[in-house]
Amino acid sequence: MRDKFFQLLLTTAIIFTQQSNLKAQEALKLSLTSCREMALSQSESLQQAEYKYQQSRLDKQIASSAFLPKFEASATGTYVFPDIDMMGMELRMRGTYMAGITLTQPLYTGGKIMTGKKLSKLGESIAAEQKRMTMMDVLVETDNAYWTLIAVRQKVAMLESYKEQMDSLFAQVKTAVEAGLGTENELLRAEASRSDILYQMQKAKNGEDLCRMSLCRITGLDSSTELELTDTTIYVKEPGLLTADINERPEFNLLKHQVNVTQQQIQMSRADMLPTIGLVAGYTYYGNIKLNSLVDAGNGTMMPYSQEFRDGLGAVMLSVKIPIFEWGANLKKVKKAKLDFKNAELELSRNSRLMNLEAQSALKNIYDGYQLIQTAEIGLKQAEENLRVTNNKYNVSMALLTDLLDAQSQWKQAKSNLIEAQTQYKIYETNYLRAIGKLDPTSSPNANNNLFLTE
């Protein structure tokens, strides 16, 4: 009796634990916007881009400080032995100290400081564009994973509906065979079709699980987290007048900045051929320097005498440095910088054509994707009507089983085509925004973005 009581208690505890786990594993509701926010917040690549941007801002501040004077302080202690003999006198420097402060102000550096500041500003702009480019890449990956998961789940739901049709048909054929109104061949055909649907469902569910884990990885969730996507209904209207302008694309701006960088590098190389002028001012205080000697006190008496030196000195210096001859090295540096500038221009020209082609391709995908949706919708309506008519004819023995199976297969394919067309269109929208450089967390097509006429 006691053992049964403990078994009952253990069973109750296990059931309670399982119920608690089921509650804890309730599906997490996610919209496309929330997925984007989560992906951006946990992206290591975006965090690295942010740190590089902060570094570029510090570099700009460092470059600006080159215009300002620099102050340096120094202190020195010296112990010299033995004492230094100076024409019968001894110079004692045991514990001598010096302390001073120096001010250095560049007056002219051939334009290096100004060029360095311009380069630091370009570096900040480059880091900002790289950060924006990384952000876009994260959004593209997130959107692709989101819409792919929706497509797979809709296909699973479609296959489940198809399976219900096949189960009903199989039961109907089986009843007819048992009543002597059908053949075993028809039953085998129905059973084979039902087995094929089960196989396709298993494949689709496996793909769904992989897509879910991929989205969990992108958003920083545990791979076992169940997800409930909210943006499952897709309404699409004809897109408006769109352009393939790449001027806002980060890659295009990066190439333009690179051209400007190489142009400034030419000025930096020329600065090596120009004189530099600097002003140096300093003040030094020294002490504990002693001079020991013997002096005549009168009557031929020599008495020891000691004097300690303790004073401060100030100095102002103007430094001028003029490069005279370096075997043409600086001139060759200028020529090399000019070649880098020409290469950067060629790189900009070549990649601009490629980016224009990519933007035009993305634009074409938008219009083609919309046409595919229209075609798929018409095909689905026709397949649904064909299935309805064929099913009615089969019920009154005016159509063969193979005709009904073909009609069901056509409906499945038409439904699958529409799912693919709709979800692929949403991916095309994201890719288009990426291609023209206007993709950001707020440019969601679901938010009635002005680039797309979506409901």
Briefly describe each language-model feature range.
Residues K70-D83, E90-M133, K256-Q265, D272-N351:
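Small/polar-residue-enriched beta-strand and adjacent coil segments characteristic
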Residues Q48-A63, T134, V138-A157, C211, ...:
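Amphipathic alpha-helical coiled-coil segments
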Residues D137-P250, N260, N365, G369, ...:
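Periplasmic alpha-helical coiled-coil/stalk elements that build and connect Gram-negative outer-membrane
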Residues I14-K23:
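C-terminal segment of classical bacterial N-terminal signal peptides
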Residues K23-E26, T33, F81, N417-E455:
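Acidic, low-complexity, intrinsically disordered peripheral segments
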Residues K121, E184-S193, K335, L401-S409:
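Short, charged, amphipathic alpha-helical segments
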Residues L22-K70, T183, S223, L229-Q265, ...:
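Bacterial Sec-pathway N-terminal export signals of envelope proteins
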Residues D3-T11:
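Sec-dependent signal peptide recognition
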